Amino acid sequence: MATEKGDQNAEKIEQSLPQKIPYWRLVVDQGVLTQQIIDYPYKGSGTEEDPYEVVWMENDPRNPMTWTQLRKWSLTMTVAVSTLAVALVSSAYTGGVREIEAEFHIGSEVATLGVSLFVLGFAIGPLLWAPLSEMFGRQIIFTVTYCALTAFNAGSAGAQNSWTLIILRFFAGAFGASPLTNAGGVIADMFHAKQRGIAMSLFAAAPFLGPVLGPIIGGFLGMNAGWRWVMGFLGAFSGAVWIICTIFVPETYAPVLLRRRAEKLSKHTGKVYVSKIDIDQGRVTLKDAFKTALSRPWILLFKEPIVFLLSLYMAIIYGTLYMLFSAYPIVFQGVRHWNQGVSSLPFLGIMVGMMFAVTYSVWDNKRYVQVQAKHGGFAPPEARLPPTLIASVAIPIGLFWFAWTNYPSIHWIVCILAGAPFGFGMVLVFLGIMNYLIDAYTIFAASVLAANSVLRSIFGAVFPLFTTYMYEDLGIHWASSIPAFLALACVPFPFLFYKYGATIRKRCEYAAKSDAFMRKLAEQMKQAPEPESEETEEPVFDRTEAPAPDVSDVSETESNVEELPDVRQMRSRASTRTASSLRRVVSYEGNPYDIDRVNTRESFTKK
């Protein structure tokens, strides 16, 4: 009787399970099952002592890596718009600053806090939302935080005093930091390392286009309808993006998806299923996740010269961009006497430069692919830097050009065109340095990116606060030259790391540990049994490429790196391709936006 009842229940489950997964089901059901998923021969016996190990099936419809290119690029564009919206919200506020000053009877330095504290909120992103997304998934964190961003934007429109407005702006920035932090992770979840370069190049334009478009939209809207309409528009725009992303963007984070699948399989079958990733890595508590996320970025920032110098360079450039939101109105409204809306149009010059940079980065990706092939899949991190060499020179050229052509006697187009080399250089510097840091710190990449983001956000928050005073005391020419001199002082950094990067990395503790990890991975792959036939699939681990040095000359730092798991376990999680090439290509699978707590577990313990 019990057997018949069990068979009936199993039959009902089978009938209720979709054989193909419709897209809406991917969005609303992270652990969606099909009969094929249930019948898959998972390793194990389904007991507490020997649970079934849940892994992706071949061509698994729920695995983001196997989705169609159309779906991947559609989602890439969607998350890019979500980051563009946040960046636009950060700067569009400047379009209503004059009206805010007049209504609340405050000075420009207090009104500017609406921008500064919003950007300061960005520093919270990698410290708070990144570990939460690794615990609960990217989808739920995005949905909740973007809803809060929309609410705080809408609340700003009804603020009755300046401090209410400023505090609401801070919370909007803090919650808006979530898509800025997690959107790159969504792209890394879907694209293999070789495909990720172009996707990230196109995606990277969004966080820069937003701040440039913001003053233009805010300027005209503030001039014609008032600052409350600016805030109202930002609330409506972010709300529309929130609705679109909530409806169309599914969960993409593999550890969470496999965990949900294991939970649902256990519930449906009565057997014990556990995600293979959780078995290999272990479940991380929320306390441990925050401990790592809050401490490790600071250790890397202040102990690693590579991280500190390149993060400082990016922070100066980022701060300069936000400084221009106060500088352009001074130059074009105060000196050239343009109205509030028209004086925001010069930001289009920066946007043109950004578009050229994105085009150039797509073209340069072909060069990088060739270098990667030449090194057998282990292109050195320094191969990422050639575009940065050009860009580092373009930035001070654009800034000095702007500083000394903003005389009223010189035609306005000359001054506006100065924004093009600055925008061109800014995007390429950011892309080149971010990729270099990821490649040089593979297993520490998430923490390095967090350190970079925090320092960058602090500079972006501080620079606008002293801009007005600087222009009043120094005049428009010398004040505009200050960031140009700072950028000029940073020009040697990319050249230094391009020429001596390999040597410097050996002398940096955590860069050396990362390199030692990659050597061990390469060595274990060499020692692994060769495929029995030519058609056997071999793995390509998704990582950012790093050099494959002579493994016979392993530094002492290797002793601090934990033994890699058995290479056959890695194969079970790796993406595969046919072994048709003559040279083995090995890549680290880790997502650069995820904190590696397995291979770095002992790296930050006190000695």
Curated annotation (Swiss-Prot):
GO biological process, alphabetically ordered: transmembrane transport
Biased segments, Low complexity type: 572-583
Gene that this sequence comes from: mdrA
UniProt family annotation: Belongs to the major facilitator superfamily. DHA1 family. Polyamines/proton antiporter (TC 2.A.1.2.16) subfamily.
Localization (cell): Cell membrane
GO CC, alphabetical: plasma membrane
Function: MFS transporter involved in the basal level of azole susceptibility. Confers resistance to voriconazole and, to a lesser extent, to fluconazole.
Gene3D superfamilies: MFS general substrate transporter like domains
Record's keyword terms, sorted: Cell membrane, Membrane, Transmembrane, Transmembrane helix, Transport
Signal peptide, first to last residue: none
Region ranges (Disordered): 523-583
Membrane topology recorded in Swiss-Prot or TrEMBL: Multi-pass membrane protein
Transmembrane intervals: 77-97, 110-130, 139-159, 170-190, 202-222, 229-249, 305-325, 342-362, 385-405, 413-433, 443-463, 478-498
GO molecular function, one term: transmembrane transporter activity
Pfam families for the chain: MFS_1
Protein name, per record: Major facilitator superfamily multidrug transporter mdrA
Induction description: Expression is up-regulated by exposure to human monocyte-derived immature dendritic cells. Expression is increased in clinical azole-resistant isolates.
Disruption phenotype: Exhibits enhanced susceptibility to voriconazole, however itraconazole susceptibility is less affected.
Ranges of Acidic residues composition bias in the record: 553-564
